[in-house]
C-alpha cells in the first residue's frame, strides 16, 4: 500500500516523520509546500489509489475527500490522526481499503489510540467484506454487504453465495466470486 501523509502544522510534520519510519516509501507533504491545490493533491492520491493520512482535524479531511468519494469497494483508504498523535481514526474504506488496519498500525507506531467505529469490528463479529478481501473474492452485488452485515450483527444466519459465475440472487443474499482461479 502506498501511503501519502498531508500535514498542516509543524507538530503535524513531526508526527508524520514518526509514522514514516514505520512505513517504507511513505510520502509526507506539507500543505503549504504542495505546489498545487489541496483539491488537486487529493484528486491525485485517489487516482493513484494511495492511502491518505491526514494529520489534522476530521473536518479538514472530510472537506478534502468529499468530492472524490465514490464507492466503498474502491475508494482510497483515509486515516486521520490529531497532531498530538492521541487518536488515529480510519475515516474511509475501513475494511476493503485497509484503513482500519492502517489506523491500528499507525497508532501502534506513535503510541496513539485507534478509533475503530465499524459495527462488525466494535461488536467483534464476522465482517463479510473483510472476509472477501482476505480470501481474494470480489463482491458482485454490493447491496448485499449491508444486509448480510445487519443479519450477522442481529445474531441471524446470513445468506452468502460463493460461485465462479455471477448468479441472480434473492434480496439480502451476498454474492462473492473468486478474482482468479489457480489450477
Model-derived segments and spans:
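Internal alpha/beta core interface subdomains
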Residues: 96-183
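Short, solvent-exposed amphipathic alpha-helical segments in soluble enzyme
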Residues: 18-24, 67-73, 96, 131-132, ...
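Short, acidic/small-residue loops that bind anionic groups at enzyme active sites
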Residues: 69-94, 101-105, 109-117
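Short, structured active-site "lid" loops
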Residues: 41-61
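Short glycine/serine/threonine-rich phosphate/pyrophosphate-binding segments
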Residues: 12-15, 60-64, 99
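Short coil/turn connectors at secondary-structure junctions
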Residues: 1-2, 48-51, 73-76, 83-86, ...
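General beta-strand structural signal in soluble alpha/beta enzymes
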Residues: 27-34, 53-56, 80-81, 114-118, ...
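N-terminal basic/disordered segments at the start of proteins
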Residues: 1-28
Amino acid at each position: 500500500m502506498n501511503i501519502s501523509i498531508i500535514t498542516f502544522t509543524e507538530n503535524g510534520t513531526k508526527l508524520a516523520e514518526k509514522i514514516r519510519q514505520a512505513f517504507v516509501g511513505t510520502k509526507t507533504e506539507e500543505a503549504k509546500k504542495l505546489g498545487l491545490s489541496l483539491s488537486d493533491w487529493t484528486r491525485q492520491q485517489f487516482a493513484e489509489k494511495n492511502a491518505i493520512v491526514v494529520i489534522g482535524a476530521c473536518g479538514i479531511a472530510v472537506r478534502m475527500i468529499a468530492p472524490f468519494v465514490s464507492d466503498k469497494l474502491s475508494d482510497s483508504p483515509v486515516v486521520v490522526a490529531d497532531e498530538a498523535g492521541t487518536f488515529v481514526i480510519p475515516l474511509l474504506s475501513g475494511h476493503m481499503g485497509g484503513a482500519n488496519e492502517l489506523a491500528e498500525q499507525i497508532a501502534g507506531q506513535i503510541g496513539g489510540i485507534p478509533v475503530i467505529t465499524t459495527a462488525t469490528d466494535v461488536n467483534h463479529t464476522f465482517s463479510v467484506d473483510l472476509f472477501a478481501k482476505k480470501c481474494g473474492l470480489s463482491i458482485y452485488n454490493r447491496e448485499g454487504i449491508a444486509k448480510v452485515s445487519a443479519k450477522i450483527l442481529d445474531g441471524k444466519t446470513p445468506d452468502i453465495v460463493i460461485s465462479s459465475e455471477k448468479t441472480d440472487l434473492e434480496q439480502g443474499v451476498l454474492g462473492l466470486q473468486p478474482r482468479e482461479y489457480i489450477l
